[in-house]
Amino acid sequence: MEQEKILIQKKNETEDEILRCALSLFVSKGYFNTSLSEIAQAAQLTKTQEIYDYFESKQQLAATLYNSIIDSLSVSIDEIRRRNKKASEQLHSLVNLLFKLTEEAPNALRFLLTVNATEFLPQEKLFLQTPAVNKMLKMIQLGINNGEIRSLSPMLIYGYFFGIINTTLELILNGTLDKKSELYQSQAWLAAWNAIAKK
């Protein structure tokens, strides 16, 4: 039984390493320019075939990555919504999280913001159709209902608010804004909030 636990743990560690290496390669080279042999080499596997012990294809590997990142974001949003009652507090906490991710998980954020996943994952939901975005829209609707946010379509408000936030994050991630992300965070928050706040 102990041997089985060790094998399962080792399998999970290897799978995580494959995912981590694939993520890094997908955001630096692009999905189509990344081969399974490059992923295997980066993950220090002895043979490319070993990837098939964990994933049926490169596309399934990418889908696992995409869904894992979306699910993690969705869980974080649930926690933010539980801790904060006002929409402004929820959105501010979400912005804090996203800026923190530029330092702690930049490749995951790059994968969400800059990689066009629909090109190679046509069967997956568009980011705007995921539970994570649906929860963001609920934050916005809460703010509209409570009079904090202008009374416009929640998706339009999403576009105004996250247009500013996501563009700032992309500029940080690609090095155009070359200082620490925290130096841009309050300015981005104020610009985004002022674009949607009810005056």
Segments and roles (model prediction):
Residues 14-23, 39, 65-69, 73, ...:
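Generic hydrophobic, amphipathic alpha-helix propensity
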Residues 1-13:
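N-terminal intrinsically disordered/low-complexity leader segments
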Residues 25, 29-60, 64:
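Helix-turn-helix
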Residues 71-74, 78, 121-146, 155-159, ...:
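Amphipathic alpha-helical packing segments from all-alpha helical-bundle domains
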